[in-house]
Amino acid sequence: MSLTGYVPQLGEPELEKRLDQVLDQALAGRTAHVFRRAEEIAPCQGERVLFALCLDAAGQNGEYFRMLRRLRQNPNLLEGCVGGLIVDGPGELYTKSTAAELALAMNEAGCALVGRPLVEATGSLANFRIQAQNLGTDPVGAYTAAAQ
């Protein structure tokens, strides 16, 4: 089954680098259709969707906000879909609140979030220390494993 990914560009390559690397590894060998603009979000039925976004130091991403608006204005846009989300930020703030906001919008648009649908990466990746220890890897390896 293919995956539809929505990855709003931040426009700051140095901040997007870590998320891009994780996505490259997580999506390797999978059929994925990746869209980067809000206008590209089209109604879908029963698909697997992934929202992966990078925030700046102020917790902002302009294209993400446009995607969020589109989800909120179209309550059946993701009807019957199953989804997940990855939120990556350069600091220790804003990732959780952004993830909660996006999860609610996805759910209200008809997308089910099943199991452990959220991967939250703070700047230090401190939230991956225990997972890294359990997996015998470093925090980046744990982040990548969680995204898969």
Regions found by a protein language model. Give the residues of each.
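FMN-binding flavodoxin-like domain, especially the glycine-rich phosphate-binding loop
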Residues: 2-37, 43-148
